[in-house]
């Protein structure tokens, strides 16, 4: 499901947008404070961010700039500022679109659909076997060596169910004396680290057999 973050301090408008977007089958998070919104944007995976400019703690332009330093998540600015200077500044700071309040909800929904259509289809996760790192939407996830080896094995065998014994042999070694339940423990570790990016469900359990990434 498409993940959208709303950062808007006008609570009535924010709730209205959340209701409308949820009705359109988007999964929505909402923050009313600029710093809270920035923290959420940088720590979770989102397909699109709807961002007001005039916010408590930190303004929308600064949020946009900081997000662009780390990731390329599409951003739509919604604001009462209608001057050409403000529009140019918003786009130059990294926004993908700029809508002046008040606006028609149907126009916003159409712009969201248009931006999402333009986004390239990416693998939900990038497991780099050369650099030994894992990124989701440009954000690097810290993993232990064992966690990385386990995720890399599953990613390299995408759509192929890996038995617990196979995983144990590849990750821990054929002569390892650890029990197969250690695989379940490390799968749980991985899911917990992927959960903030809404990627924990990418590792599926095949009951009585093992695990697979679809």
Swiss-Prot record:
Principal localization? Answer: cytoplasm
| Gene Ontology biological process terms, A to Z | regulation of DNA-templated transcription
- In-chain residues carrying the UniProt-annotated modification 4-aspartylphosphate: 52
Localization (cell)? Cytoplasm
Which residue ranges run through the membrane? Answer: none
Q: Which PROSITE patterns match?
A: OMPR_PHOB (PS51755), RESPONSE_REGULATORY (PS50110)
Q: Which residues bind DNA?
A: 113-214
Q: Name one GO molecular function term.
A: phosphorelay response regulator activity
Assigned keywords, A-Z? Activator, Cytoplasm, DNA-binding, Phosphoprotein, Repressor, Transcription, Transcription regulation, Two-component regulatory system, Virulence
- Write out the GO cellular component annotations: cytosol; protein-DNA complex
The family database entries (PANTHER family) matched by this protein are listed as: REGULATOR OF RPOS
- What protein name applies here? Response regulator ArlR
């Amino acid at each position: 499901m498409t993940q959208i973050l709303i950062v808007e301090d006008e609570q009535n408008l924010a709730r209205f947008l959340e209701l409308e977007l949820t009705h359109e089958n988007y999964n929505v998070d909402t923050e009313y404070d600029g710093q809270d919104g920035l923290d959420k944007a940088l720590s979770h995976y989102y397909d699109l961010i709807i961002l007001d400019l005039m916010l408590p703690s930190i303004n929308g332009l600064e949020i946009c700039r900081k997000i662009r330093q780390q990731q390329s998540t599409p951003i739509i600015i919604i604001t009462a500022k209608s001057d050409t200077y403000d529009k140019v500044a918003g786009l130059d700071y990294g926004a993908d679109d700029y809508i002046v309040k008040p606006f028609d909800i149907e126009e916003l929904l159409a712009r969201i659909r248009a931006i999402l259509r333009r986004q390239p289809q990416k693998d939900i996760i990038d497991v780099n076997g050369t650099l030994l790192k894992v990124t989701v939407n440009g954000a690097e996830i810290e993993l232990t060596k064992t966690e990385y080896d386990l995720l890399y094995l599953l990613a390299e065998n995408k759509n192929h169910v890996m038995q617990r014994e196979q995983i144990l042999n590849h990750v821990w070694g054929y002569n390892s004396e650890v029990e197969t339940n250690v695989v379940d423990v490390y799968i749980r570790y991985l899911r917990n680290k992927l959960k903030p990016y809404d990627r924990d469900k990418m590792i599926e359990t095949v009951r009585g057999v093992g695990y697979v990434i679809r």
